Amino acid sequence: MSAEIKPYRISIGDDVLDDLKSRLRNTRWPEAELVEDWSQGAPLKWIKDICRYWSEEYDWRGREARLNRFAQFTTEIDGLDIHFLHVRSPHPEAMPLIITHGWPGSVVEFHKVIEPLTDPTVHGGNAADAFHVVCPSLPGFGFSEKPKTTGWGVGRIASSWAVLMDRLGYSRYGAQGGDWGSAITTAIGAQDAEHCAGIHVTLAMSTRPNVEGQPTPEEMRALNGIQHYADWDSGYSKQQSTRPQTLGYGLTDSPSGQAAWILEKFWAWTDCDGHPENILGRDELLDNVMLYWVTATAASSARIYWESFGAERRTVHKVGVPTGVAAFPREIVTPVRRWMETNFSNIQHWSEMPKGGHFAAFEQPALFVDDVRAFFRKLR
C-alpha cells in the first residue's frame, strides 16, 4: 500500500456530458402521480422541469470550476483510493477537523462552510476558531474508489479516516458528521480516542433505553418521528440495505431516475416549507446529483446500507470523548439527550437549532459553522 498523497482535480469528459444530455432528452417518462402532493413520490412536473434545466441550462463546466476551487487529493488506504478535500487554514494554530457526509449527500454539502471554518476572520469570526478542514468522499461515493470486496461498513471507514488524519500529520483532531457521517464520526470517537479530541454530530445515533414509566413529551416526539420514518420514509433504506445491486441498474442507466431518487429526500428531509428549492438552489441540488451520475456510483453508494445494516447494526459504540450535538428541528429523528447518554458518557454541548434539517451544512451553513466553532472552542 502506498502512502502517497496525489493532487486531484475534477475533470469530466465531454463524452460523459453529451451522453447525459442525450439520455435526458430521451427519457421515457411515467404517468403523473395521482395526488396533489409528494405522498406518492417526487412529482412528475417538477422532475421533468429539473431534467429539462439539467439538459438545457445547467452549466457543468462552471460548476466544475467552482467545485475545484478547494484543494483535492487522493490517497490509498486499505487498498482503496480515497478522494478528499484538504483545506488548510491560514491561521497556524488551527485545529484539524474531519467532516463526513452521508447518503444521498456528498462533499458538495460542505462547500458553503469550508471557508468560514478555515478562515473565520474573513467571515465574521475569530482566528482562535480556525480549522484545517478535511472532507473525504465515502468509499464508493463521488470520486473515491468503489470497494472491490465486501467489508466496507462504518467501522472500517472510521479506521480509514483515522489513518488519513495520521497520514496528513494530524496527531490530534476533531470529527464532525451527519447521516452516515454521524455514525462514522461516532465510531471514530470510540476507536481513536487517543487522537480524536471530540466529536460533533447532527444526527444523534441513539435508541430509547429500557426505562420504566411513560415517555416524556420530548421522547414521544422522537418516537412518533421514528414511527413516521418507518411507515413513510424508509423504503429507500430497505431496498439499499437488502438489494443495492438491483437498484443500481436503473439508477446508473437513467439520469432522471437517479435525480428523482436523490431529490425526493431533499423534500422529505430538509426544512424547506414543502419544496426543496425553497432552501437550496437548483444548481446546488444538481451539483450533488452530478457526483453520483458522472461517477456511476448509484449501486456502490447504496452498498453502505447493505454493509452496515447487517452484523454492524448490532455494534453499539460506547463513546467517552467530548461530544457535541446540534439538534435541527427537521432532522429525520429528533435526538433525545437521555437516550444518547446511555452510550455517550461525555456530552458537553447540546444545541436546539431554530431551523434546518438533515443536510445541516448545506441548508443552514451559518448556524452549522457557529455551532461547530462553539463546541470545539472548549477543546483547543
Where are these regions (language model features)?
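Non-catalytic accessory segments flanking enzyme active sites
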Residues: 17-89, 93, 284, 293, ...
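Glycine-rich "HGGG/HGxG" loop immediately N-terminal to the catalytic nucleophile
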Residues: 60-62, 125, 138-152, 186, ...
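Short beta-strand element of the alpha/beta-hydrolase
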Residues: 94-102
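The serine-hydrolase catalytic nucleophile loop
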Residues: 103-115
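Conserved hydrolase catalytic core segment
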Residues: 116, 120-123, 170-219
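Conserved alpha/beta-hydrolase
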Residues: 117-143
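Conserved acidic catalytic loop of the alpha/beta-hydrolase fold
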Residues: 155-173
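C-terminal subdomain of alpha/beta-hydrolase-fold enzymes, centered on the catalytic histidine
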Residues: 240-380
